[in-house]
Amino acid sequence: MMSLLFYAPLFSYEVKEWDRKKKALLSRINRSEFGYYGLNDFQTDRHSKKNRYSLDFEGIFSEELEEFKKEANLEYLRVMDIWTLKYTKKTENHCPHNHRSIGYTGLMYLEYDDKV
């Protein structure tokens, strides 16, 4: 007998006015505060004291977050934490992992090389 071990829905959205919103978010990311931490094989601003753009993210992407809130049937939605990863070598990666059984996790590719 086969049964489902867990259910993992995927919500995917096309961002309206992507160029403007991308530029707005990139302007809030302090690129000088990236570093390697612990065993991580990527650079991040996760541990930077200047990483305080979750409210900016909510404002910039309010339409898309509202769409997600309705589709996920949520009464309340708040971005609790946000950080950026930066890969500069082909060997850098972020391994699959989970964030416990509460809440949602989002992923956005701001800049990438579509040839890789």
Where do the model's predicted regions map?
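Detector for methionine-enriched segments
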Residues: M1-M2, M80, M108
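Non-heme Fe(II)/2-oxoglutarate
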Residues: M1-Y76, N93
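Residues at beta-strand starts and edge strands
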Residues: Y7-P9, R78-M80, I102-Y104
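Generic internal hydrophobic packing segments that stabilize the cores of diverse globular domains
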Residues: E58, S62, D81-T84, G103
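A short glycine-rich, His/Asp/Glu-containing loop-to-beta-strand
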Residues: L74-K86
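Catalytic core of non-heme Fe(II) oxygenases with the double-stranded beta-helix
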Residues: T84-V116
